């Protein structure tokens, strides 16, 4: 514990005491075919985390085939002409590594963590499946069953899965963010060899991919390996990311309420329209990050102290700001109420608290503490290879490397007036959706 605290204090002093232009100090190179290489050296351990990031997510899927990006993620483990489906993961495990993948609304990433000496092996495997993925119609049919089962676990058999899907649609009437990344059953049923293969050939091309490597290596070491295996892969024309623009909800609030016997406590949620880093009043992006930290970043905030510790109205409160997405999403506030707490009493207390922020803003101490906590979190992210990969996935959502590198400077520069203005933009109107989850 003493070592943890001393490390925490060291990083806190470092982050608060100097300009942060250069958080990760990535080494960057782009091949002639458009493939970008980003290397973040980290000598803490002789391992590397390798991420192959594709700038395509389920919000880019064609309407009859929503979720096909997630399905293709599954099929990417089916092998190539030289590496069988069963062999791909076995090779990595045999060399002491681990591999995983994730598909979001805005990107798909394939990650492997392994000893540095096997870096070339992984890049060879990734280049092979970027260009030579091989699967059959029968494997498509079989994998559909796997995804149907995954959907049952996530949605039908999850206490809040269906409520979450209704919430997505309430927040996004027309935008594809309103459809869950896994898709609906009728979408999954429509997948075929042709549609999956076309999706692969459309988006999985070097000029739509970024190789991100964090760990004990350097660009000088990585570049010739990437050139050897990826350099001859041809680039292709990438379609524009065509998404429906979400219209104004014209003051409509949709309320979702669910009773579930597997839920033992009342959970309340409010979601407000908010600009993001790329669309709308983007000047509010960094102040909204700070506001979210002030409201529900951790159990030491004034917001938490008032509602949980002083008034004992809730067991927990938190906030979320989804400003990093490619298109605007929401600013959310959620709470798990104390046992036997009256919902109306809590809502009144929350409403009064938010009105106070809208009228008076937040305090200098709250601003200082929020910045300190955000920058301390960043210090520990920087030391982790996998967390570093996660940060750089924002490149698929429209961020630049410069924005990532100057993130801490932008946070440091946020003023009380900017937080107050951002709060008025996000919280003055009625929420676009609320969701109350009750015991059955």
Protein language model annotation of sequence segments:
Residues 1-4:
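Positively charged n-region of N-terminal signal peptides that target proteins for export
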Residues 68-76, 291:
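Active-site His/Glu-centered metal-binding helix of metallohydrolases
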Residues 22-51:
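Mature N-terminal segment immediately following signal peptide/propeptide cleavage
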Residues 152, 169, 238-302, 410:
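His/Glu-based metal-binding/catalytic segments typifying zinc-dependent metallopeptidases
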Residues 40, 45-71, 85-130, 162-186, ...:
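M16 family metallopeptidases and their MPP-like homologs
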Residues 197-229, 431-432:
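Non-catalytic, conformational "gating/processing" segments within enzyme and secreted inhibitor domains
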Residues 6-18:
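Bacterial N-terminal signal peptides
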Residues 78-81, 130-138, 362-363:
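Short, polar/flexible loop-turn hinges at active-site or ligand-entry regions and domain interfaces
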């Amino acid at each position: 514990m003493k070592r943890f605290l001393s490390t925490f204090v060291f990083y806190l002093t470092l982050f608060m005491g100097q300009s942060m232009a250069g958080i990760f100090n990535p080494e960057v190179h782009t091949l002639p075919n458009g493939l970008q290489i980003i290397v973040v050296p980290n000598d803490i351990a002789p391992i590397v985390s390798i991420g192959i990031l594709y700038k395509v997510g389920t919000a880019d899927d064609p309407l009859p085939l929503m979720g096909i990006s997630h399905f293709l993620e599954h099929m990417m483990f089916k092998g190539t002409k030289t590496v069988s489906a069963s062999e791909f993961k076995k090779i990595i495990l045999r060399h002491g590594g681990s591999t995983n993948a994730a598909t979001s609304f805005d990107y798909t990433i394939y990650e492997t963590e392994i000893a540095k000496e096997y870096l070339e092996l992984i890049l060879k495997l990734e280049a092979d499946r970027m260009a030579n993925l091989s699967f059959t119609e029968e494997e498509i049919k079989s994998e559909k069953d796997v995804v149907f089962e995954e959907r049952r676990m996530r949605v039908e058999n999850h206490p809040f899965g269906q409520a979450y899907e209704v919430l997505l649609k309430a927040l996004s009437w027309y935008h594809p963010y309103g459809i869950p990344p896994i898709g609906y059953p009728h979408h999954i049923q429509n997948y075929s060899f042709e549609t999956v293969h076309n999706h692969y050939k459309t988006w999985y091309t070097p000029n739509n991919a970024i190789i991100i490597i964090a760990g004990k290596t350097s660009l000088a070491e990585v570049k010739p390996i990437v050139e050897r295996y990826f350099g001859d892969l041809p680039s292709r024309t990438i379609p524009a990311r065509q998404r429906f623009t979400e219209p104004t909800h014209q003051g409509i609030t949709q309320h979702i309420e669910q009773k579930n016997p597997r839920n033992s406590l009342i959970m309340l949620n409010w979601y407000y329209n908010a600009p993001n880093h790329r669309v709308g009043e983007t000047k509010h992006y960094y102040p909204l990050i700070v506001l979210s930290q002030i409201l529900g970043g951790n159990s030491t905030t004034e917001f938490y102290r008032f509602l949980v510790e002083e008034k004992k109205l809730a067991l927990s409160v938190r906030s979320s700001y989804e400003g990093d997405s490619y298109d605007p999403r929401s600013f959310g506030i959620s709470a798990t109420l104390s046992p036997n707490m009256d919902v109306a009493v809590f809502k009144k207390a929350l409403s009064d608290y938010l009105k106070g922020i809208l009228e008076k803003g937040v305090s200098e101490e709250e601003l200082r503490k929020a910045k300190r906590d955000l920058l301390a979190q960043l210090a520990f992210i920087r030391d982790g290879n996998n967390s570093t990969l996660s940060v750089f996935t924002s490149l698929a959502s429209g961020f630049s490397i410069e924005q990532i590198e100057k993130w801490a400077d932008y946070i440091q520069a946020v003023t009380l007036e900017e937080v107050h203005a951002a709060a008025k933009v996000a919280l003055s109107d009625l929420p676009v959706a609320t969701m109350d989850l009750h015991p059955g």
